[in-house]
Amino acid sequence: MGKYQSSKVFDGFSTVFRQWKATDTHCRFVHGYGISFKVYFEGELDDRNWVWDFGGMKRAKTLIDGMQPKAWMDYMFDHTMIIAEDDPELQAFKHMETAGVAQVRVIPATGAEKF
């Protein structure tokens, strides 16, 4: 029998970032986005005719940076500030985190296309 597919959208994430290399546009400034993810699952149907138990996301065996997938999405994108590791103002953003006014996440590069 063929494989079946289902999908789930995880949304409601609010994050900000800036593209500091975009020096000639407003994208160089910190700006926010509503982020969502659409995850696809493929496999055989189980005895309930499900490809995936969406409630099982919290029990997923595959981890991202040591976290369950949904916990990782929350950690990375729920009211956070995403900063590129080569941003010349990185220390200023880290200071904001130390001061308790931002949850900073440092990644190799920023941009909606990079997530």
Which residues does each predicted region cover?
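Charge-rich, low-complexity N-terminal segments
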Residues: 1-115
